[in-house]
C-alpha cells in the first residue's frame, strides 16, 4: 500500500510564549499516537513537530490513505454448551444475532481452553479522511491548556483564536472540520515580511515554503538553534560570552518567527549598579541577552532578537536602547535610595513583614535564626558571633526598594549593602549564600558561617511550618518544605552534625506550646524519607535501605557507607550472609527475656563454640575499622565468619528445650547481629 506524508497546521493568533514548545510537542505526539492506534502508519509514527508564535503543526511520514483490511474473529459460546439435542441454545442464537450472522455462517475455533463458536469476517479498512477529523479533535482536546477562550461568534474554545487549518496528505487536501474550520492548503507567513497567502503544494514542502515564501522558521528547535548560533557568533566577535539563561532562550524562540540578532548598548555609568540587577532587568523585563567579558563582568553591550529583518536596523536598536535606558535608570535609582539606610536600621521594618500569621513576623523569625545559627556555628567550630550577625542581617534586604522590585535578588542585594555598611566579607557572603542550595544541583554555601545561617534558615522553616500543620501532601508543598529538607540533607552530608539534635534546637527556638509537640519526631521521619529519595538517585534502593535502617544521625559518612555496602554486595559470601542475618533477626524477635552477654559454660556444641570464637575475633577488627571510617574493611571481615555461620545453622537448634541454653544461643546471635549490622542492615540487601 502506498503511503505519503501527512501535514496538519493550525494557524492561530499569537500563542503564549512560555507554553509554545510544550503545546507543539504535545499536539504532534497526540496526532502521531492517534495515527498509530488507527493503524494508518506501520509501527511507530515518524513525525516532526512545528511550533511558532502563530502556528502549531505536525508532519508525519508514511501515512496510509486507507487502513489495511482486517480479519475479525468474534468468539461466542463454547461448543459443548451451544447446541442441545441438535438445537441451537438461546446463547448461540443470541451470539449469531448480535454478530449480524446466520448460525450456518459461524465457524468453530479453539480459544486456548476449549472449542467455541466464532464469526469470522473481513473488515474493510476506513479511509484516512474518515478517521482524521476525530484524531485531530482528540489531539486538540488533550493539549495542556490551563485556560481557553472563545472568539467571534464561535462556540469552539482554544488557547488562542484559530483562523486556518491545513490538512494535506501528499499534495491532496483531506477534507475535515476542526474548531469550526474547513481544511485546506492555504496559510499565512510572517505578519510583516511575508507577501500574503501561501499555498502549500505538498506536505513535504511545508518547512521550505514557510521559510522561503513565508519568512517563517516553523521548527521551534530550528529557530532556537539559529538564535543560539547567532548569539554565540556575535558574542565571539565582541570577545564576550552570553549570560546563560536557557528559559530566556526558549521564551525568545517562542516570540519570533524570523529571528534576527542585533547588537545594542547602554551608558557605562549604569555599570556602577550591581550587575545582577542589570542582568535581571535585561533578561526578565526586556528579553535581552547580556554580555560578559572574559572575567565574567557585565559589559555595556547586549544582544537582542528582533522578529524583523531590515536593511537599516538602527531604528530598532535605538528603540530598544531607549526602553532599556528607562529600566536601568529605575534600577540605578533604587540602588541609590537603598544606600541611604543601613541594613541594621531596616530591621524594625521587619516587624511589619508577616512570615506566617501563626508564627509571627520576619523580625520574630530573625531572633530564632540568630540563636539557631550561633548554635550550629559553635558545633562547626566557626565564629558564632559572626554567624549570629549574618543571621541578624540575612532578611534585612527584604524591605529594600531593589528587592521589592526584584524579589529574586534577595540575599544578593543584602551582600552588596552589607559591604557598603562595612560588614566583613564573610558576613556579606553569608547573607547571600544562606539561601543556598535553592534547588537540586545548586551549589552549597562556601563557608561554615554561611552554612550555619543556611541550615538555621531551612531548619526554622521546616520545623516551624510543619509544627503549625502545613505538611506537604501529594504535589502540594506551598512552603517548599521538601526543598528545604533536601538542602539541609545536602549540607549535613558535608558537615558532621547530628540531624535530630539540630531539629530539636530549631524546635526549642519557638515559644513553648506554639508548635505541635510531635514536630521533632515527625520532621526527623520526614527527613529520613527525603534522604532515601535523594540517595536513590545514585544508589540501588536495597543498598540505601540497608544503610538508612541504622537511622544514622550524622550524614557526613553516608557516602562511604553506601560505597562500602555496594562493594560488599558483590562478594560471593554476601547473599548467604544477608540471608543468615535475616534469619538471625527473625530468631531474635522470639526472645522471651532481655538479651545479654554470652555464657561460655553453656556453649554445648562444637558449631556454637566455633561461632563464638569467630565472633570474639571479629569484634575488635570491626570496631577498629568502623572507628576509622573504613567501612569497606568492616564489611569484608564478615566474609571470614561465613563457614561458622553456615555450620551453626546447619547443626544447632537455637530454640532448645533448655531455657538457659536457648537464651545463651540467642545472646550469641545477638552479638553476631551487632557485628553484621555495624555498618548497615545487610539483611535488606537483595530485597
Swiss-Prot record:
<dbReference type="InterPro" id="IPR006194">
    <property type="entry name" value="Gly-tRNA-synth_heterodimer"/>
</dbReference>
<dbReference type="GO" id="GO:0006426">
    <property type="term" value="P:glycyl-tRNA aminoacylation"/>
</dbReference>
<keyword id="KW-0963">Cytoplasm</keyword>
<dbReference type="Pfam" id="PF05746">
    <property type="entry name" value="DALR_1"/>
</dbReference>
<keyword id="KW-0030">Aminoacyl-tRNA synthetase</keyword>
<dbReference type="InterPro" id="IPR008909">
    <property type="entry name" value="DALR_anticod-bd"/>
</dbReference>
<dbReference type="GO" id="GO:0004820">
    <property type="term" value="F:glycine-tRNA ligase activity"/>
</dbReference>
<dbReference type="GO" id="GO:0005829">
    <property type="term" value="C:cytosol"/>
</dbReference>
<dbReference type="GO" id="GO:0005524">
    <property type="term" value="F:ATP binding"/>
</dbReference>
<keyword id="KW-0547">Nucleotide-binding</keyword>
<dbReference type="GO" id="GO:0004814">
    <property type="term" value="F:arginine-tRNA ligase activity"/>
</dbReference>
<keyword id="KW-0648">Protein biosynthesis</keyword>
<keyword id="KW-0067">ATP-binding</keyword>
<comment type="subunit">
    <text>Tetramer of two alpha and two beta subunits.</text>
</comment>
<comment type="similarity">
    <text>Belongs to the class-II aminoacyl-tRNA synthetase family.</text>
</comment>
<protein>
    <recommendedName>
        <fullName>Glycine--tRNA ligase beta subunit</fullName>
        <ecNumber>6.1.1.14</ecNumber>
    </recommendedName>
</protein>
<dbReference type="InterPro" id="IPR015944">
    <property type="entry name" value="Gly-tRNA-synth_bsu"/>
</dbReference>
<dbReference type="GO" id="GO:0006420">
    <property type="term" value="P:arginyl-tRNA aminoacylation"/>
</dbReference>
<dbReference type="Pfam" id="PF02092">
    <property type="entry name" value="tRNA_synt_2f"/>
</dbReference>
<keyword id="KW-0436">Ligase</keyword>
Amino acid at each position: 500500500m502506498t503511503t505519503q506524508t501527512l501535514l496538519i497546521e493550525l494557524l492561530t493568533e499569537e500563542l503564549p510564549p512560555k507554553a509554545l514548545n510544550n503545546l507543539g510537542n504535545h499536539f504532534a505526539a497526540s496526532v502521531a499516537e492517534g495515527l498509530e492506534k488507527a493503524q494508518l502508519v506501520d509501527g511507530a509514527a515518524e513525525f516532526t513537530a512545528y511550533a511558532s508564535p502563530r502556528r502549531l503543526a505536525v508532519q508525519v511520514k508514511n501515512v496510509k490513505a486507507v487502513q489495511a483490511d482486517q480479519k475479525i474473529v468474534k468468539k461466542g459460546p463454547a461448543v459443548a454448551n451451544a447446541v442441545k439435542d441438535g438445537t441451537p441454545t438461546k446463547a448461540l442464537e443470541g451470539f449469531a444475532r448480535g454478530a449480524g450472522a446466520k448460525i450456518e455462517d459461524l465457524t468453530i475455533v479453539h480459544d486456548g481452553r476449549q472449542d467455541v463458536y466464532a464469526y469470522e469476517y473481513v473488515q474493510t479498512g476506513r479511509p484516512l479522511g474518515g478517521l482524521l477529523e476525530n484524531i485531530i479533535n482528540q489531539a486538540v482536546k488533550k493539549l495542556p491548556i490551563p485556560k481557553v477562550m472563545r472568539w467571534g461568534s464561535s462556540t469552539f474554545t482554544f488557547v488562542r483564536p484559530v483562523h486556518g487549518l491545513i490538512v494535506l496528505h501528499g499534495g491532496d487536501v483531506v477534507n475535515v472540520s476542526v474548531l469550526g474550520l474547513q481544511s485546506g492548503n492555504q496559510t499565512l507567513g510572517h505578519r510583516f515580511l511575508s507577501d500574503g497567502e501561501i499555498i502549500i503544494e505538498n506536505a513535504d514542502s511545508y518547512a521550505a515554503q514557510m521559510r522561503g515564501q513565508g519568512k517563517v522558521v516553523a521548527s521551534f528547535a530550528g529557530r532556537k538553534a539559529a538564535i543560539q548560533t547567532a548569539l554565540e557568533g556575535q558574542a565571539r566577535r565582541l570577545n564576550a560570552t552570553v549570560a546563560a539563561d536557557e528559559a530566556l532562550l526558549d521564551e525568545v524562540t517562542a516570540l519570533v518567527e524570523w529571528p534576527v540578532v542585533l547588537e545594542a548598548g547602554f551608558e557605562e555609568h549604569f555599570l556602577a549598579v550591581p550587575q545582577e540587577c542589570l542582568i535581571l532587568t535585561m533578561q526578565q523585563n526586556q528579553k535581552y541577552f547580556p554580555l560578559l567579558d572574559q572575567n565574567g563582568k557585565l559589559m555595556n553591550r547586549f544582544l537582542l532578537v528582533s522578529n524583523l529583518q531590515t536593511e537599516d536596523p538602527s531604528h530598532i536598536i535605538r528603540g530598544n536602547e531607549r526602553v532599556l535606558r528607562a529600566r536601568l535608570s529605575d534600577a540605578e535609582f533604587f540602588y541609590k535610595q537603598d544606600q541611604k539606610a543601613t541594613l541594621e536600621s531596616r530591621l524594625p521594618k521587619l516587624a511589619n513583614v508577616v512570615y506566617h500569621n501563626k508564627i509571627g513576623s520576619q523580625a520574630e523569625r530573625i531572633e530564632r535564626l540568630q540563636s539557631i545559627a550561633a548554635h550550629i556555628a559553635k558545633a562547626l567550630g566557626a565564629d558564632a558571633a559572626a554567624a549570629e550577625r549574618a543571621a541578624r542581617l540575612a532578611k534585612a534586604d527584604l524591605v529594600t526598594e531593589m528587592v521589592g522590585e526584584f524579589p529574586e535578588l534577595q540575599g544578593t542585594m543584602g551582600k552588596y549593602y552589607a559591604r557598603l555598611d562595612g560588614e566583613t566579607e564573610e558576613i556579606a557572603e553569608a547573607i547571600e549564600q544562606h539561601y543556598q542550595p535553592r534547588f537540586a544541583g545548586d551549589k552549597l554555601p562556601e563557608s561554615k558561617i554561611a552554612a550555619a545561617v543556611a541550615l538555621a534558615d531551612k531548619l526554622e522553616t521546616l520545623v516551624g511550618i510543619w509544627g503549625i500543620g502545613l505538611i506537604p501532601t501529594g504535589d502540594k508543598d506551598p512552603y517548599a518544605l521538601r526543598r528545604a529538607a533536601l538542602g539541609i540533607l545536602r549540607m549535613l552530608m558535608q558537615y558532621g552534625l547530628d540531624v535530630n539534635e539540630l531539629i530539636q534546637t530549631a524546635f526549642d527556638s519557638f515559644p513553648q506550646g506554639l508548635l505541635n509537640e510531635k514536630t521533632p519526631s515527625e520532621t526527623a521521619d520526614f527527613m529520613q524519607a527525603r534522604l532515601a529519595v535523594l540517595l536513590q538517585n545514585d544508589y540501588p534502593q536495597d543498598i540505601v535501605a540497608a544503610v538508612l535502617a541504622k537511622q544514622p544521625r550524622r550524614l557526613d559518612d553516608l557516602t562511604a557507607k553506601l560505597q562500602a555496602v555496594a562493594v560488599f554486595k558483590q562478594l560471593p559470601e554476601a547473599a548467604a550472609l544477608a540471608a543468615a542475618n535475616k534469619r538471625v533477626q527473625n530468631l531474635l524477635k522470639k526472645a522471651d527475656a532481655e538479651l545479654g552477654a554470652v555464657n561460655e559454660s553453656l556453649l554445648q556444641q562444637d558449631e556454637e563454640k566455633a561461632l563464638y570464637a569467630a565472633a570474639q575475633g571479629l569484634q575488635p577488627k570491626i570496631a577498629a575499622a568502623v572507628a576509622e571510617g573504613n567501612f569497606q574493611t568492616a564489611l569484608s571481615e564478615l566474609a571470614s565468619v561465613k563457614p561458622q555461620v553456615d555450620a551453626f545453622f546447619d547443626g544447632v537448634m537455637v530454640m532448645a528445650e533448655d531455657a538457659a541454653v536457648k537464651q545463651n544461643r540467642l545472646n550469641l546471635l545477638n552479638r553476631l547481629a551487632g557485628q553484621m549490622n555495624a555498618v548497615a542492615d545487610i539483611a535488606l540487601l537483595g530485597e
